[in-house]
């Protein structure tokens, strides 16, 4: 596995060891999405690659290139090194946010839909995932076909489920934490497709060797997009009394998003519902959401 700093490996191994014994099955190397060093060496002796790294925080960055540059350049570095090393297949973690169309109306996401990065409603994160994934497919299309590198792409929604360490500070889990602690006094009129981290991990592994996965995009998450109101009601009915069920008007959220970076990062979803066609993943991997 790759990390940005080898100083993190001790904690990672400790967290993994709570669940399985990783000895002899896990090695670490230090890689940076924005630097060339180490990529070719990291791929030596490998047959398959999972490229899951991409920067994300809940706030919209002042400069969208803080997301876009490492997402695109990191993907290209991984692909070039994989091709040079003779890797059989790469499985790339993209996102449902690369499938939003114009992000200006509710729609059903599927394998053929792409986010229009020119739309004013598209966040920097959505742009970064869209551009990174498109650059990957372009690389595959343009490569030397004599010994082709295969590609499969996984497109999850916001990721929930158990963490290795028990830490709930991640972007998606942090949203539920804020709901439970009453730190979200008014709810946005927005809906999200939820992805279980265990499903995502399983599909990534299955996509490595499943012949039918080559050249495909797979949405891994719920077919139905759940509104914040629905999530709040579920939490409320399960005893979380601090959860607010008050709804903020869309016009107010969109207006405030021009000045608030937390809200601006949600513009893709405010006032819209994106249901998803997960049938390709269900059929290919015999999987149920």
Feature-to-residue mapping (PLM):
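Glycine-rich Rossmann NAD(P)(H)-binding loop
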Residues: 161, 187-190, 218-226, 236, ...
């Amino acid at each position: 596995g790759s990390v940005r700093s080898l100083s993190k490996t001790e904690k990672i191994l400790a967290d993994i060891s709570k669940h399985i014994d990783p000895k002899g099955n896990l090695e670490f190397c230090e890689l940076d999405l924005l630097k060339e060093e180490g990529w070719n060496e990291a791929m030596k002796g490998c047959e398959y690659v999972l490229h899951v790294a991409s920067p994300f925080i809940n706030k919209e960055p002042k400069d969208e290139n803080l997301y876009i540059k490492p997402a695109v350049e990191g993907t290209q570095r991984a692909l070039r090194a994989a091709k040079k090393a003779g890797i059989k297949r790469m499985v790339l973690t993209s996102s449902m946010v690369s499938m939003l169309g114009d992000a200006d109306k509710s729609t059903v996401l599927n394998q053929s839909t792409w986010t229009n990065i020119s739309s004013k409603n598209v966040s920097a994160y959505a742009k970064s995932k869209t551009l990174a994934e498109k650059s990957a497919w372009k690389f595959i299309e343009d490569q030397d076909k004599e010994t082709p590198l295969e590609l499969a792409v996984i497109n999850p929604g916001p990721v929930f489920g158990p963490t290795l360490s028990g830490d709930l500070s991640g972007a998606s889990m942090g949203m539920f934490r804020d709901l439970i602690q009453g730190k979200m006094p008014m709810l946005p009129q927005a809906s999200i497709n939820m992805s279980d981290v265990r499903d995502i991990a399983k599909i990534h592994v299955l996509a490595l060797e499943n012949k039918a996965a080559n050249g495909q995009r797979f949405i891994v998450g719920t077919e139905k997009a759940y509104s914040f109101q629905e999530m709040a009601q579920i939490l409320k009915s399960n005893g979380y009394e601090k959860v607010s069920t008050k709804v903020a008007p869309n016009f107010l959220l969109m207006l405030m998003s021009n000045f608030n970076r937390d809200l601006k990062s949600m513009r893709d979803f405010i006032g819209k519902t994106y249901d998803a066609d997960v049938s390709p993943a269900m059929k290919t991997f015999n999987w149920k959401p």
